[in-house]
């Protein structure tokens, strides 16, 4: 069956669920890419043994970390339809009373299941805009989109490694920055970008790959402290798909030219190498014509952004019950409870809104991020508001 994320067992469970909802077999066969013979085998196995038929033959455990079993999720949905006015706490209690053998999910998990199935009534008057995420834009105006990357490390003459951080303007090809750094550590990148924002203003969006420090594999939605800072400044984030550097093709072509002109051979020291980068920047922007620009030079088209950098703007949450500052260790402190949220939001204000008894919604700026419940202190992420979830929580 198709799908490179879900296992075969997941696909069969989805197939059976939709069959039970009354969808036609022919349409399901076509969508799942299976024959009618295979289709009827799956249905017959279900009729003989129920969902356990798939569980028994699967090598996957019934319950995985951070993954609610399919059967439990379906029970929650079924209970909600039986008791449409009940919220997560009452449904959870019903689960505990009538299905005592089931590992009881947290209230926030129950609420997230209801939300995922469209069974949570949304309050009016609240709009949740979304970033383009991995939907890549093709913008024509200077500073609408910057492209960033590290031009792979290379060794200098003194055996020290150099990590060039490069930034280009997408529309004009203007090479805004090529800064030789000692590492890809976040602190150094912060310093470079703050200086760029002061000198050139703020872009509309920044496109990057999924590497450090632009993303963080273990953080909520793959965000990093750097990308959270960009969001606070009103800068959108775009990410190319993993293993698809051609999606940042203009930037990659510049890297080829940069490598040929400045690293063969490399300079002896980092300062001397930076001199080579500066010479290249001037030539690339002011002397070298570009065929894609009708033989114009990037400097002929580029101008600094009208959006000035003035530090982090204030953020407020008028539609929420509380505003709290995430601690340096990534916690939300509420009524004596310490909820581990994410360290990438350390020092930033988030909005909290109570949606059920003991269940709270966490929002960052205009983005709803997660639920947590006070009883278990467990956080349940919502659907990624920045696009397809490239990196897990």
What residues fall within each predicted segment?
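Short, Lys/Arg-enriched anionic-surface-contact patches
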Residues: 1-14, 62-70
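Short, amphipathic alpha-helical "recognition" segments used to contact nucleic acids or chromatin
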Residues: 7-23, 73-82
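Charged alpha-helix within mobile-element recombinases
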Residues: 226-310, 351, 355-358
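Mobile-element integrase/transposase regions
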Residues: 70, 112-168, 172-175, 182, ...
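Mobile genetic element proteins and their domesticated derivatives, centered on retroelements
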Residues: 15, 29, 39-42, 50, ...
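C-terminal, beta-rich DNA-binding module of retroviral/retroelements integrases
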Residues: 281, 285-393
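Basic, flexible linker segments flanking DNA-binding modules
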Residues: 51-147, 153, 224, 297-307
């Amino acid at each position: 069956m198709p799908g490179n994320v879900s296992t075969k067992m997941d696909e069969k469970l989805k197939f059976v669920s939709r069959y039970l909802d009354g969808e036609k077999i022919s349409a399901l066969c076509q969508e799942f890419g299976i024959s009618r013979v295979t289709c009827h085998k799956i249905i017959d196995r279900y009729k003989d043994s129920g969902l356990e038929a798939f569980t028994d033959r699967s090598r996957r455990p019934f319950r995985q970390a951070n993954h609610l079993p399919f059967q439990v999720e379906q029970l929650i949905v079924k209970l909600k339809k039986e008791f449409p006015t009940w919220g997560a706490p009452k449904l959870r209690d019903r689960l505990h009373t009538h299905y005592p053998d089931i590992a009881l999910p947290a209230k926030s998990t129950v609420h997230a299941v209801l939300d995922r199935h469209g069974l949570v009534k949304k309050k009016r008057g609240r709009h949740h805009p979304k970033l383009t995420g991995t939907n890549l834009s093709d913008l024509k105006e200077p500073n609408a989109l910057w492209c960033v990357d590290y031009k792979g490390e290379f060794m200098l003459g003194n055996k020290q490694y150099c990590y060039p951080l490069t930034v280009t303007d997408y529309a004009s090809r203007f090479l805004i920055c090529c800064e030789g750094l000692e590492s890809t550590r976040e602190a150094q990148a912060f310093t470079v970008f703050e200086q760029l924002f002061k000198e050139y203003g703020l872009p509309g969006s920044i496109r990057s790959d999924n590497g450090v420090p632009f993303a963080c594999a273990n953080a909520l939605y793959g965000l990093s402290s750097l990308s959270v800072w960009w969001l606070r400044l009103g800068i959108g984030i775009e990410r190319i798909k993993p293993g698809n550097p051609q999606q940042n093709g203009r930037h990659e072509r510049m890297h080829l030219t940069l490598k040929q002109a400045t690293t063969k051979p490399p300079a002896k020291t980092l300062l001397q190498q930076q001199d080579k980068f500066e010479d290249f920047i001037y030539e690339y922007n002011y002397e070298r014509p570009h065929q894609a620009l009708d033989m114009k030079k990037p400097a002929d088209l580029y101008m600094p952004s009208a959006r000035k950098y003035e530090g982090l703007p204030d953020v407020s949450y008028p539609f929420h019950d509380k505003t709290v500052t995430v601690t340096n260790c990534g916690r939300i402190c509420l009524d004596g409870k310490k909820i581990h949220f994410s360290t990438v939001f350390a020092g930033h204000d988030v909005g909290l809104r109570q949606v059920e008894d003991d269940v709270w919604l966490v929002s960052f700026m205009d983005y709803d991020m997660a639920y947590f419940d006070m009883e278990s202190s467990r956080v349940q992420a919502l659907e990624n508001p920045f696009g397809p979830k490239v990196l897990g929580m």
